[in-house]
Amino acid sequence: MQIEHCRVNHLANPLGFAMEKQVFSWVVEDAKGKYQKEARILVKVGGSIAADTGWKNLDSVAATVELTLKPRTRYAWTVAVRTDAGEEAVSEENWFETGLDTWQAKWIGCDDSKPRHPVFTKRIEPGREVSSARLYICGLGLYEARWNGEKIGNEYLAPFCNNYNDWIQYQTYDVTQQLNAAGALSVELGNGWYKGRFGPDRKQKPHYGDSWKLLAQVHIAYTDGSEEIIGTDESWKVTRSSIFFSNIYDGECRDDTLPEVAPVKAIPVEAPKGTLSERYSTPVTVRQALPVKEILHTPAGAEYDGNLPLACEGTEGNADSSAIRRNSPGRQFLPGQSAHRQSGVHLHFRWSPPCAGAEVYLLWLPVCEGAGHFPFERRGFY
């Protein structure tokens, strides 16, 4: 007998999610008995017992535990089950970790009159051996965080689609491995649902706010028991990326021929209107990478969002435009979405003829498959 699919609030090992109420669930597999007779949930913090239900008739779909949670704390838990046939098994150890309670960081921004999207950076040099490190972050409209240029986590489109006038969710990332050495934390912002247009209106007016904003706080716990907190403030620097246009409907435009922009100090900005909270939305991740096997025809229509891989050869200054043309044979058009441009543009920046090879770029492109063919390779879906 085995106990599998252990979840808290239907999430496997959730990090930084809102936990006003904790609901535990599990599945018993390969049991000889016909039903679960009784179960016991044990919750620990750092090896000490925080809650113990004892053996009782617990609901395997929605069991609750009397537990007062502390912020920034990891709770380990197991569930033991007995069946009517006298079998007994204990699950593997699972966990959930609570979010931040007090923010020392400030909301920061930049000159919003410039179209090139901002990249905020901070040099971090841990002074001792790191035991654990967490990044608590929210960037508006959208953000992607990187450590020494490498993406942190596997999520996209954070902080997702919600009513920013009412609430704004921040995300938590385990950055222990990254902060074992000195490096640069960088955060690139896009327009997203907050700052970009929202709906079929062609006008590029912001829906919730018109300014890029960033709030980030790094907590470092050292092996000697000390802690260090690094938050966004005026000491952070801001430069510009090669992306000068982005939209959840229209994709993005990137020009790698643009000159580098010297970093300047970030500026303090007002907090957004909505209440900041732990995350509720589950991660948006790449679910599949599919090779081309056949051309599909979907009379009913379907919609995909994803990255279009572009292998390109060209000369400096030439532009590649990958577009889904509307309402033409063999192309894609989704009725009712006529305001969606559905194109991605990239400017070459490093090749001159003859070109010995090609490089692949991933362009964010909302791909709409209507009543027609699907002529290009599908690599990832969100």
Task: Annotate the PLM regions.
Residues M1-Y382:
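Extracellular/oxidizing-compartment recognition motifs
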